């Protein structure tokens, strides 16, 4: 699996940048992580290895994620079976050789809300909590120079490797690391994304400070998180679960979140989108058969969660490191 992580290419990509030293330390760090592994990792990685060798002649990452080429019915069936071995698929959708992975989330809808506000051309990007890498591929489609994603979830890594197997030359890497496992004050990325992470953090201000420390001077943060209505004094701390999630800590209002970003030292703070998540955007599918948003909302009132709290609403904020 270490070979699939493609660290030699990552080190070459980061040579001569502030991230060069960190890149040189990654093989040892990831070797240690792989030694610990996960009970299902062999099965998931086996699904990746079961993918048929197929030539890719068409790639689309700008308008959607899709690639294809010559593929007979037997190979397509083998491809679908291997990809089903990586269920549940949460972020997407993906289209490979005519196989459509209808993921739990319509992540392309979120990307349509975020992308118009960004200029990623030639940027060196870090995606914190990157999941299976869907957004990283779309960042490349928007012109990014290189994208590094971190997420400690092994299933998400294998889902990413399934795509990278067919697109090995793309400058995108998924590292099975938590944000806390990165060195402090990397100060090496032009743009840092944190989408769907902040509300899982017990100390959200510290998270914002750590994100700032990963950026170069003048670098840009793209922050997406759950919010509530209200003024700068309004922050929701759930008593227990929120939309059936246990690990949700702070849901600020947009004005409160803007204040947090300014207190963390960011400038040019602006909110570019606020959207309530619909049951069309997050739902169970053939590729994710567990409970989803429809089960997490009050069946009589979709403006509330089953706990009686405001239904999930997400804001996208952009800020600059001075």
UniProtKB/Swiss-Prot annotation:
<comment type="similarity">
    <text>Belongs to the class I-like SAM-binding methyltransferase superfamily. CmoB family.</text>
</comment>
<dbReference type="Pfam" id="PF08003">
    <property type="entry name" value="Methyltransf_9"/>
</dbReference>
<feature type="binding site">
    <location>
        <position position="314"/>
    </location>
    <ligand>
        <name>carboxy-S-adenosyl-L-methionine</name>
    </ligand>
</feature>
<dbReference type="GO" id="GO:0008168">
    <property type="term" value="F:methyltransferase activity"/>
</dbReference>
<feature type="binding site">
    <location>
        <position position="110"/>
    </location>
    <ligand>
        <name>carboxy-S-adenosyl-L-methionine</name>
    </ligand>
</feature>
<dbReference type="GO" id="GO:0002098">
    <property type="term" value="P:tRNA wobble uridine modification"/>
</dbReference>
<feature type="binding site">
    <location>
        <position position="199"/>
    </location>
    <ligand>
        <name>carboxy-S-adenosyl-L-methionine</name>
    </ligand>
</feature>
<feature type="binding site">
    <location>
        <position position="129"/>
    </location>
    <ligand>
        <name>carboxy-S-adenosyl-L-methionine</name>
    </ligand>
</feature>
<dbReference type="InterPro" id="IPR029063">
    <property type="entry name" value="SAM-dependent_MTases_sf"/>
</dbReference>
<keyword id="KW-0819">tRNA processing</keyword>
<feature type="binding site">
    <location>
        <position position="91"/>
    </location>
    <ligand>
        <name>carboxy-S-adenosyl-L-methionine</name>
    </ligand>
</feature>
<dbReference type="InterPro" id="IPR027555">
    <property type="entry name" value="Mo5U34_MeTrfas-like"/>
</dbReference>
<feature type="binding site">
    <location>
        <position position="105"/>
    </location>
    <ligand>
        <name>carboxy-S-adenosyl-L-methionine</name>
    </ligand>
</feature>
<comment type="function">
    <text>Catalyzes carboxymethyl transfer from carboxy-S-adenosyl-L-methionine (Cx-SAM) to 5-hydroxyuridine (ho5U) to form 5-carboxymethoxyuridine (cmo5U) at position 34 in tRNAs.</text>
</comment>
<dbReference type="InterPro" id="IPR010017">
    <property type="entry name" value="CmoB"/>
</dbReference>
<feature type="binding site">
    <location>
        <position position="195"/>
    </location>
    <ligand>
        <name>carboxy-S-adenosyl-L-methionine</name>
    </ligand>
</feature>
<protein>
    <recommendedName>
        <fullName>tRNA U34 carboxymethyltransferase</fullName>
        <ecNumber>2.5.1.-</ecNumber>
    </recommendedName>
</protein>
<comment type="subunit">
    <text>Homotetramer.</text>
</comment>
<dbReference type="GO" id="GO:0016765">
    <property type="term" value="F:transferase activity, transferring alkyl or aryl (other than methyl) groups"/>
</dbReference>
<keyword id="KW-0808">Transferase</keyword>
């Amino acid at each position: 699996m270490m070979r699939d992580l493609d660290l030699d290419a990552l080190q070459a990509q980061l040579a001569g940048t502030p991230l060069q030293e960190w890149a040189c330390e990654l093989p040892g760090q990831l070797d240690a992580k792989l030694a610990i592994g996960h009970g299902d990792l062999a099965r998931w990685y086996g699904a990746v290895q079961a993918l048929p060798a197929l030539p890719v002649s068409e790639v689309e990452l700008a308008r959607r994620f899709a690639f294809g080429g010559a593929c007979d019915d037997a190979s397509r069936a083998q491809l679908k079976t291997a990809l089903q071995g990586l269920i549940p698929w949460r972020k997407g959708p993906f289209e490979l050789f005519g196989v459509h992975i209808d993921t739990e989330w319509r992540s392309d809808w979120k990307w349509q809300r975020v992308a118009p506000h960004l200029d990623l051309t030639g940027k060196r990007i870090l995606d914190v909590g990157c999941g299976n890498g869907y957004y990283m591929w779309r960042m490349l489609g928007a012109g990014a120079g290189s994208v590094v994603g971190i997420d400690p979830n092994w299933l998400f890594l294998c889902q990413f490797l399934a795509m990278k197997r067919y697109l090995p030359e793309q400058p995108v890497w998924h590292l099975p690391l938590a944000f806390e496992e990165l060195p402090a004050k990397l100060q090496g990325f032009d743009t840092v994304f944190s989408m769907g992470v902040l509300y899982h953090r017990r100390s959200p201000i510290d998270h914002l400070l750590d994100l700032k420390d990963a950026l170069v001077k003048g670098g840009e943060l793209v922050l997406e998180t759950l919010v509530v209505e209200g003024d700068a004094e309004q922050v929701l701390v759930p008593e227990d679960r929120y939309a059936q999630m246990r690990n949700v800590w702070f849901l600020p209002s947009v004005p409160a979140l803007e204040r947090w970003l300014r207190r963390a030292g960011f400038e040019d703070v602006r909110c570019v989108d606020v959207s309530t998540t619909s049951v069309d955007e997050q739902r169970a599918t053939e590729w994710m058969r567990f409970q989803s948003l429809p089960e997490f909302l009050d069946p009589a009132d979709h403006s509330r969660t089953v706990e009686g709290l405001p239904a999930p609403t997400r804001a996208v904020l952009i800020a600059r490191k001075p």
